Amino acid sequence: MDMSPTPEFPASLEWLNLSKPLRMGQLRGRVTALVFFNVGSAWCQQRLSDLATLRKRYGEHLHVVAIHVPRFDHERDPKRVLKRLQRVPLDFPIAHDADWVLWQHYVIDAWPTVVL
């Protein structure tokens, strides 16, 4: 595993529910869970729901950033992803990593994966 400092979020990420891109520097010193998920997976939907519950329980002591990584071509459309996600109320930033940049940096090999 690469133990280098946490990289800045790549410019290629599309933030689905933020007006301005999130910067990794905004999270420094905070307990943060990066969850790599796929919108088409029921297992991933459950993990997102679990993390939303933990956010409610721990408030500002736990930050969550969800990173959607498409598995199929139709999941590359961020509008479709956002539409699917509106079924579950989530109060944390959601990014669309269409090019798998963060997935590759963290050497992720399965959905869902949570990195603290």
Per-segment meaning from a language model:
Residues 9, 94, 101, 110-116:
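A short, hydrophobic beta-strand/beta-hairpin element that forms part of a small beta-sheet core
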Residues 34, 65-67, 95, 115:
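Hydrophobic/aromatic beta-strand patches that form the interior of the parallel beta-sheet core
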Residues 7, 39-43, 49, 53, ...:
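Proline-centered helix-kink/hinge sites
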Residues 28-30, 60, 90-91, 108-111:
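Active-site acidic short loop of glycosyltransferases
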Residues 1-25:
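N-terminal "domain-start" segment that seeds a small globular fold
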Residues 22-46, 51, 64-65:
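Short active-site neighborhood of thiol/selenol oxidoreductases, capturing the structured segment around
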Residues 45-88, 98-104:
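Structural microenvironment flanking redox-active thiols in thiol-disulfide oxidoreductases
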